[in-house]
Amino acid sequence: TLDYLQSLYEKKLCTYPRTDSRYLTSDMAEGLPVLVNLVANAMPFRKGIAISCDEAQVINDKKVTDHHAVIPTRNLQNADLSGLPVGERMILELVALRLLCAVAEPHTYSETAVTVECAGAEFTTKGKTVERPGWRALDAAYRSALKNAEPDKENEDKILPELSEGQTLPISNAAVKEGKTSPPKHFTEDTLLSAMETAGKEDMPEDAERKGLGTPATRAGILEK
């Protein structure tokens, strides 16, 4: 991933890649709406989705150390993305998605919790109703555009019918299932990088300049050794 980002940086299609910052600096706020609109027009997955830009969500000088977050550059406007290697194009689209989602409208929904009693035992379920898709519309469009993309079951909304307090419901079926808990998953290169980034987080003061093991520029090299 870092190699792809480095190549995109050398082609002037994205900013400096060796950073773990998630924020931009205040001097970038004025030009951000133009950049967001340009990036959105260059990305095929955003067709038909309205784009907004709330700069306040990503501008924070205090949370930027040496370099701001990785974002696409204005050179996308005249770039032929179809000519990029597949890996570079996919990484560039992912960087663009993260920027567009970060400044998009919030995803808003209402949640309903239902508790039912049966044979003296209580059972609870929850369901969501989306009010405004917000940034999730972009995320869903990006995922659906990927070939062989697995459905995002973790964020799949469970829709409940209209219910009222004290209502009696028929039981369609019931079953007792036995199972075993799963052991923690083995570390992968991706989860190791994340663990290095947050190592010792609980023991560090809030205003610490750096946290974790290594830096964005050295963590991948440490794992390779």
Predicted feature descriptions by range:
Residues T1-K225:
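Core catalytic DNA strand-manipulation module of type IA topoisomerases
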